[in-house]
Regions:
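Short, contiguous acidic/charged loop-to-helix segments that flank catalytic cores in large enzymes
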Residues: 121-127, 229-231, 236, 277-289, ...
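Short hydrophobic core segments
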Residues: 265, 319-327
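Catalytic cores of nucleotide-enabled group-transfer and carboxylate-activating enzymes in metabolic
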Residues: 285-292, 306-317, 321-322, 345-349, ...
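Terminal amphipathic helices with adjacent charged low-complexity linkers/tails
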Residues: 233, 272-275, 325
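Flavin-dependent oxidoreductase catalytic cores
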Residues: 1-242, 246, 250-262, 270, ...
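Beta1-alpha1 glycine-rich phosphate/pyrophosphate-binding loop at the start
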Residues: 108, 241-308
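Glycine-rich dinucleotide-binding loop and its adjacent helix/turn
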Residues: 220-232, 296-297, 307, 326-363
Length: 363
C-alpha cells in the first residue's frame, strides 16, 4: 500500500510542475524504521538481514522512478548516522547507498541522527558543518552527487565544503527561515546582510513538534509572508523605538525600510539587549551573529542610534510614534531564603557583577 502511494504522490508532484521530490529515508521516520534493526523486528521478506531491511526503501525509489520517468529528480535522504542503539552499521549504510543508486535515485542527501538520538546534531552548541566528514566518507562508494547538511548557516561554510570536494551540494532548511533571501545575498557577495540562523530551534522545530506553525525567533515573517507584508508607507513618520534588543532592532529596521525616520534609544552602550548575555554562554556563540546582522542593518537602513541614552519625555518629544521594546526582567521565584544575598539572577552572573563559587544550585 505504501509503495504505490509514494509513487502516486511523486507522480502528482510531477504533474503539478515539480522537477523532483525527496524521499525521506532518515531521521527515524517510517522508511528509516524499516532499515534499522532497532525498529525492524520482522522475520519475513521485509526484515532480518540488512538486505531485507533496506528492501522497502529500495522499492519506493524504484517505483517512483517507474512512475515519473528517467528525467525526474529523485533525492534520497539516507541516514548516514542513526546515532541510536541498534542503528545501522557503516557497511549496511554503504550497501543501502549503492542499492538506492541502482534503484534510480538521482542524488543522495545526508541524514544525521534520529530525532530520538541523545547526541546533539543541529543545536547551537554543535559546530558549523560538524557532520560533513560523514558525507565525505560515503563519496568513494557511490557515483551519485552528494548533499551535505546540518549546521551550514553561512556562505563561507558552504563554499568550503564544496571547494574541499566534501559534497556536490549543500542543504539548507532553518537558515532559509531566518533569511529567505540567503541564496540571493550569497550570490550577490553580501554575506554581511544575511540574518544568520543561530540554531536555537525555538520557533521552528519546537513549534512543529507541538503541532504549531513553524516560524523563526529571528524572523517574524517566516511562514507568515502572506500576512506580514512590509509595504512602503505613503505617510512617513518620525518614530522613536526604545530598547535595542532583538525586538527593538527588528522594529526599527523594518520601520526604516518602510520609509519612516527612525531613532533607536537604549540606555546600554551596545545594541543587542539580552543577546549580549546569551552570547557569553559556552555553546551559544552564534548569538554574536544576530548582533552582527543588526549592526549592519541599522547602518543600511539609516536608523539613528542613540546608545547610552535613557529615554525620557524630553528626548521623546517631537516624535509621531513611540515604540516601547524594553524587554523583560528576570522572574524572581519566592521561597524561604530567596532574599539572601547569595541568591542572584543570571544577569548578575553573566554580567560579571557576581562571582559564583565552585558549588552553585541553579533553580
Amino acid at each position: 500500500r505504501h509503495r504505490p502511494a509514494c509513487a502516486a504522490a511523486a507522480r502528482r508532484a510531477r504533474e503539478a510542475g515539480y522537477d523532483g521530490v525527496e524521499v525521506m529515508g532518515s531521521e527515524g521516520y517510517f522508511i528509516n524504521e524499516f532499515t534499522a534493526p532497532r525498529t525492524n523486528k520482522r522475520n519475513d521478506a521485509w526484515g532480518g538481514t540488512a538486505e531485507k531491511r533496506m528492501r522497502f526503501a529500495v522499492e519506493i525509489v524504484r517505483r517512483v522512478r517507474e512512475a515519473c520517468g528517467p528525467d525526474f529528480i529523485i533525492i534520497y535522504r539516507l541516514s548516514l548516522l542513526d546515532l541510536v542503539e541498534d542503528g545501522n552499521q557503516w557497511d549496511e549504510i554503504v550497501a543501502q547507498a549503492k542499492a538506492i543508486e541502482n534503484a534510480g535515485a538521482t542524488i543522495i542527501n545526508s541524514g544525521i541522527g534520529w530525532h530520538e538520538a541523545r547526541v546533539p546534531t543541529i543545536v547551537t552548541s554543535v559546530p558549523r558543518a560538524a557532520f560533513v566528514d560523514v558525507t565525505a566518507k560515503l563519496r568513494p562508494h557511490v557515483t551519485l552527487p552528494l548533499i551535505a547538511t546540518n549546521r551550514i548557516n553561512m556562505p563561507d561554510v558552504a563554499e568550503r565544503i564544496l571547494a574541499d570536494g566534501i559534497a556536490d551540494m549543500v542543504s539548507l532548511a532553518r537558515p532559509l527561515l531566518a533569511d529567505s533571501q540567503w541564496a540571493n545575498k550569497a550570490r550577490a557577495g553580501k554575506p554581511q546582510s544575511i540574518n544568520t540562523c543561530i540554531a536555537c530551534n525555538q520557533a521552528c522545530l519546537d513549534h512543529v513538534f507541538e503541532n504549531k506553525r513553524a516560524s523563526c525567533l529571528l524572523n517574524p515573517r517566516a511562514c507568515a509572508e502572506t500576512e506580514l507584508n512590509y509595504t512602503k508607507t505613503f505617510k512617513p513618520k518620525r518614530i522613536a523605538v526604545v530598547g535595542a534588543g532583538p525586538a527593538g532592532l527588528a522594529c526599527a529596521t523594518v520601520a526604516a525600510e518602510r520609509g519612516h525616520r527612525v531613532t533607536l534609544f537604549d540606555a546600554s552602550a551596545e545594541i543587542g539587549g539580552q543577546f549580549n548575555y546569551a552570547k557569553k554562554i559556552p555553546g551559544k556563540e552564534e548569538f554574536h551573529e544576530t548582533i552582527r546582522y543588526f549592526t549592519h542593518k541599522l547602518e543600511e537602513t539609516g536608523v539613528e542610534v542613540k546608545l547610552g541614552t535613557v529615554a525620557s519625555a524630553e528626548n521623546l518629544s517631537g516624535f509621531d510614534e513611540v515604540v516601547l521594546a524594553t524587554g523583560i526582567l528576570p522572574r524572581r521565584v519566592a521561597f524561604p531564603g530567596s532574599d539572601h544575598a547569595k541568591v542572584v539572577s543570571y544577569l548578575d552572573v553573566l554580567s560579571g557583577r557576581v562571582q559564583v563559587g565552585k558549588r552553585a544550585a541553579i533553580i
